[in-house]
């Protein structure tokens, strides 16, 4: 079963886990409207995250525009412009192969790297199928926000299975 980041965050939120605020947009106009809703709560800095079933979205490239799959926007106008460069495009990451995956949805989220009054931390949590044993494996790490493959290679002790 594959779920998008926004769906996983909704599940965690339903269990009382405090998560980054965000909304799902399917058009650049919706992205701008939703970012305005977020900016009333915190700041104008917004993170736009392509929603595809693959990792490496931040370093991935949209074939048609050259944009990354995860970008920071500093204003509402920038949200709309950057959304145009992502939505409808084909995102190629190290996990998608050259064919990439079409981006139909965008997570419009608050920037958690702000210098605000609340402390913010990122973690990694994944449930994977170990194909060799046919068993689900839960992986967790304090090194959230980065490619977990890189953490596994450089600091395997930071991953709990």
List each model region and its residues:
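Hydrophobic alpha-helical hairpins/lids featuring a short glycine-rich hinge
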Residues: 80, 92-161
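Duplex nucleic acid-engaging cores and interfaces of nucleic-acid transaction enzymes
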Residues: 75, 87, 108
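Glycine-rich phosphate-binding loop of ATP-grasp-fold ATP-dependent ligases
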Residues: 20-22, 48-82, 124
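Gly-rich Lys/Arg/Thr-decorated short loops/hinges at beta-loop-alpha junctions or inter-strand turns
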Residues: 11-17, 61-64, 157-159
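ATP-grasp fold ATP-binding core
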Residues: 5-12, 41-61, 93-116, 125
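Structural signal for hydrophobic packing residues in well-ordered secondary-structure cores
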Residues: 16, 35-42, 80-94, 128-133
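A conserved helix-loop-beta module that forms one wall/lid of the active-site cleft
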Residues: 1-37, 44
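Generic, ordered loop/turn and secondary-structure boundary motif
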Residues: 4, 12, 26, 53, ...
């Amino acid at each position: 079963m594959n779920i998008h980041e926004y769906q996983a965050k909704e599940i965690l939120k339903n269990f009382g886990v405090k998560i980054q605020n965000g909304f799902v947009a399917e058009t650049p106009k919706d992205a701008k409207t939703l970012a305005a809703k977020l900016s009333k709560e915190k700041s104008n800095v917004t993170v736009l995250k392509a929603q595809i079933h693959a990792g490496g979205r931040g370093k991935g490239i949209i074939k048609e525009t050259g944009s990354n799959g995860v970008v920071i926007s500093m204003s509402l106008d920038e949200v709309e412009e950057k959304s145009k460069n992502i939505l409808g495009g084909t995102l190629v990451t190290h996990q998608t192969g050259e064919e990439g995956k079409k981006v139909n949805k965008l997570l419009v989220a608050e920037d958690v790297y702000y210098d605000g009054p609340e402390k913010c931390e990122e973690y990694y949590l994944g449930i994977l199928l170990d194909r060799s044993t046919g068993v689900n494996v839960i992986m967790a790490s304090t090194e959230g926000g980065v490619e977990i493959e890189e953490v596994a290679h450089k600091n395997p002790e930071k991953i709990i299975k």
